[in-house]
UniProtKB/Swiss-Prot annotation:
Part of the nascent polypeptide-associated complex (NAC), consisting of EGD2 and EGD1. NAC associates with ribosomes via EGD1. Residues 122-136 have a biased composition (Low complexity). This is Nascent polypeptide-associated complex subunit beta. InterPro entries: BTF3 (IPR039370), NAC_A/B_dom_sf (IPR038187), Nas_poly-pep-assoc_cplx_dom (IPR002715). GO terms for cellular component: cytoplasm; nucleus. The lineage of its organism: Eukaryota, Fungi, Dikarya, Ascomycota, Saccharomycotina. Residues 14-42, 122-158 are annotated as: Disordered. Residues 35-100 form the NAC-A/B domain. PROSITE patterns: NAC_AB (PS51151). The keyword Transcription applies.
Amino acid sequence: MPIDQEKLAKLQKLSANNKVGGTRRKFAKKSGSSSKDDSKLQDQLQKLRAVTVDNVQQANFFKDDGTVLHFNKVGVQVAPQHNTSVFYGIPQEKSLQELFPDIIPQMGADAINALTQMASQLQSAQGANQQAAAPEAEGKDIDIPELVEGQTFEADVE
């Protein structure tokens, strides 16, 4: 049986591209760590018998540096017998000034008094810093020597 060289060349060319079993495809690995973490957290909360608190519209966490972690749409679960509270949501880091008008009705009288004291302390500290900065600026010019080309200060150091 004679072999047609053209057909043989076409078959060899096709077989070079398509290996037996098809081409190998690489699958992108999906990171499922966040869903695993959430399921572990949910399991622990079920063990603690946490109760979901409804009708919570927002939550604010005040940090020491003066910023606020603001949760606009928040889910809350509480396990009071274990002194545990869990807040779900996407936090936004905001300054206190951004949230200030909306926060006042939510705060108690003690917190408002503390805020007014903090504001007065900040204003007095800023005023003191400005007064202290003015004499320092004049004194700094005296201590700084002028640079002269060719002059070195190595002799003074030794």
